[in-house]
Amino acid sequence: MSKITSSTLLKYKQEGRKFTALTAYDASFAGAFDSEGVDVLLVGDSLGMVLQGHDDTLPVTTAEIAYHTRCVRRGIERALLIADMPFMSYATPEQAMINATELMQAGANMVKVEGGHWLLETVTKLTERGIPVCAHLGLTPQSVHVFGGFKVQGRDAENAQRILDEAKALEAAGAQLLVVECIPAPLATAITQALTIPVIGIGAGASTDGQILVMHDVLGISSGYIPRFSKNYLKQTGEIRSAVRAYIEEVAAGTFPSAEHTFS
């Protein structure tokens, strides 16, 4: 079984082959997702909400992400493993270097950071020192209080152009992947077509190169607010592994996300 790398995902993009990603936080679920063929696993700071019960992701620490990264690493053989850098863990390039090193040593293949132009120097410096970076634009949950809540981003022409420009700049700075969250589908299409690197969408339509969801949403075990862009695959299959396979199959076929999971 060949390991998934950033080069694998780039090849998938070039071939027009859609790929899947899920969040994971422990060895057991990660192992199940990995063995069923999920290409990318993210130890997300979403754990602050789905595991710890917080209202947002801000309380999560680098040490907590590192702990769960070690857990996930022990459970997988194939998938590319990305670790989120938590709120204020990369406020400066120097701080980012220290915390990203901890996550890479915990077993991550790549780290993910949220933000646009202000991050360019950090992305370049991490990349130059052997730490691959996944960027994240659109609805960036660590900025939820700046946005005034979990809201769709890039609906007006000015902000859409800003997000597109930031995507291009992050690629030029060295980012190897890009996540776009809760943006209109036409904007996600424009970004995906403009970039050479693979683009992963969540609430961004079906045109992106890959899709990512939070595992708790896929399995229908999230409490409280359920995002419009999510889908409960366990409800339609009744078994965890079957739910994961259904997710993979629908992404590959381009039937997920459908219009009901997409913003205009």
Curated annotation (Swiss-Prot):
Pathway as given in its UniProt record: Cofactor biosynthesis; (R)-pantothenate biosynthesis; (R)-pantoate from 3-methyl-2-oxobutanoate: step 1/2
Binding site for Mg(2+): D45, D84, E114
Principal place of residence: cytoplasm
EC numbers for this chain: 2.1.2.11
InterPro entries reported for this sequence: Pantoate_hydroxy_MeTrfase (IPR003700), Pyrv/PenolPyrv_kinase-like_dom (IPR015813), Pyrv_kinase-like_dom_sf (IPR040442)
Cell compartments where the protein resides: Cytoplasm
Cofactor(s) required, per the database record: Mg(2+)
Keywords: Cytoplasm, Magnesium, Metal-binding, Pantothenate biosynthesis, Transferase
Record: residues binding 3-methyl-2-oxobutanoate: D45, S46, D84, K112
Cellular component terms (Gene Ontology): cytoplasm
Keyword Cytoplasm: yes
Cofactor note: Binds 1 Mg(2+) ion per subunit.
MF (Gene Ontology): 3-methyl-2-oxobutanoate hydroxymethyltransferase activity; magnesium ion binding
Catalytic residue positions: E181
GO terms under biological process: pantothenate biosynthetic process
Quaternary organization: Homodecamer; pentamer of dimers.
Family named by the database record: Belongs to the PanB family.
Protein role: Catalyzes the reversible reaction in which hydroxymethyl group from 5,10-methylenetetrahydrofolate is transferred onto alpha-ketoisovalerate to form ketopantoate.
Protein name, entry field: 3-methyl-2-oxobutanoate hydroxymethyltransferase
Phylogenetic lineage: Bacteria, Pseudomonadati, Pseudomonadota, Gammaproteobacteria, Alteromonadales
